Amino acid sequence: MPLYKVVFDERFSASRAFAEEAERLGQSVHGIKGDMTDLWYHDLHARWTEEPAAIAGLTAHGPIFCLERLAWDHRMRVVFRVDHRYRQDGSIEHAISGPSSMLRRATALSDEINWSSEMANLVARCPATRSQTSQSNVIGPTAKRTDDPEHLISWVIAPVHRA
């Protein structure tokens, strides 16, 4: 599905790497610094009022929480979500929820040190129709970047179209 915008948090290395890869793939990216208010009032609200449009991102919990609630009023939902949690042993756990076709692709994260760049590739391929949601957990190698929080979330919000 085409993405109207890819949102990233400028404060976090993993999120910046995600944005760089999304931009390399030809996506329109928008940086925030933890607060999505400006994005909402100066872009998304008008766009979604005119016509719902899919967005994706890699952020902390706050922005996706707010965007998800705002999307409901425009008949849009979170159709893909991956919670990335750094673990004590130096690995990272990816808790994946989304279409089974994406879960199959997401299993590659178990071998991916540059997981945030791979997530940009993955969200760009999210199917346009909402299908049965599946869940999976994948643990992979990583080096925690010093400016990353313990928990980041990759997500896609899209119009609700049933398969």
Q: Over which residues does each language-model region extend?
A:
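Extracytoplasmic/lumenal soluble domains of exported proteins with redox or metal-associated functions
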Residues: 2-163
